[in-house]
Amino acid sequence: MPGGGPRGTYAREEAPGMKILCAIDGSRHSQWALDWLPHVCSPDDCSLLLVHAVDMAQFKSLSKLDRKTRLAMVNLLECSLEGAARLLEGAELRASTSWDSIRAKLLRGHPAEAVVRSAKREQADLLVIGSRGVTEFQPMLLGSVSRKLLMQAPCPVLVVKKPMTGLKRVVLGADGSIESWEAIAWLTRLPEHSRPSVTVASVIPPLPKESLRLPSRALAVGNQVEGVLRREAKKLAARAAGTLRKAGWSAKGIVLSGPPGAELITLAGRERANLIIVGSRSRRSAHEYFMGSVADTVVKHAPCSVLVYRN
């Protein structure tokens, strides 16, 4: 690596507990991501890997260029690698005030693909990314990099959208899935100093009764179904909140009605939440994920950071 590489302190097999991979791109959002880390995992029980990817695709056809252009491209490549090394070293220095088990690694390849490969290879338990790239001109989540990360990551993804001012209030969307129960278990493992109050929300999606102009008998059946769904949602929210309270947390369960993503976002604004947690089941294709996922809606429009919990 030109200019030397990040120092890296621990081999993977020596690192304890939870394995966190944090993608660094030089933006203020990735700096905020570093500040979030001690609040989601005790540095004594976790290892941290900082990664930055340099896309080498633009340098693959150097042999086809004239000598002057080729030399300029080689110089650009060296500068890119040196800049990436400095970026990682700075991030490692910033994180070292809280963490002992840190490594930093420069990846080569398309950023999303390289980060996903690294997360799989390292068997990461959590991937942390900033919500905007370096340019700030558009949300990172509208681009292909973060789309691929959210779709293909082999672990939960924490999307940092705001600076860390203390993890005080969390909104958790409970739908009875394995992912939402595992998210609750994840919450109970947060460090002692990061024990926020939790609002567990079970959301009943709207039934299309009015739009279909159903006859009165069908409307009555629809109302009965809605009543059953509400009772089940109430049980689910109460059970989830009870699980957290048994673990020593301050938690309450509520039932909401409406589009789940929009309801969770509104609730987070009302509660002034620092974090929304939603589950995301595996999808067969990118189209399915991004054309209707509750997690996608929440990540795009939430007023706070979001943890997308994947099994």
Q: Language-model features: where?
A:
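Structural beta-alpha unit
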Residues: P2-P16, H29, Q58, L71-E78, ...
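Small/aliphatic-rich secondary-structure junction motif
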Residues: G8-L71, S96, D100-I102, R169-N223, ...
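A short acidic, glycine-rich active-site loop
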Residues: R70-R86, A220-K235
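Glycine-rich, Arg-bearing micro-motifs that act as flexible, cationic patches
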Residues: L126-K148, L167, L275-H301, N311
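Short beta-strand elements of ligand-binding domains
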Residues: G130-S131, P156-K162, V306-R310
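Short, structured interface segments
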Residues: L142-P163
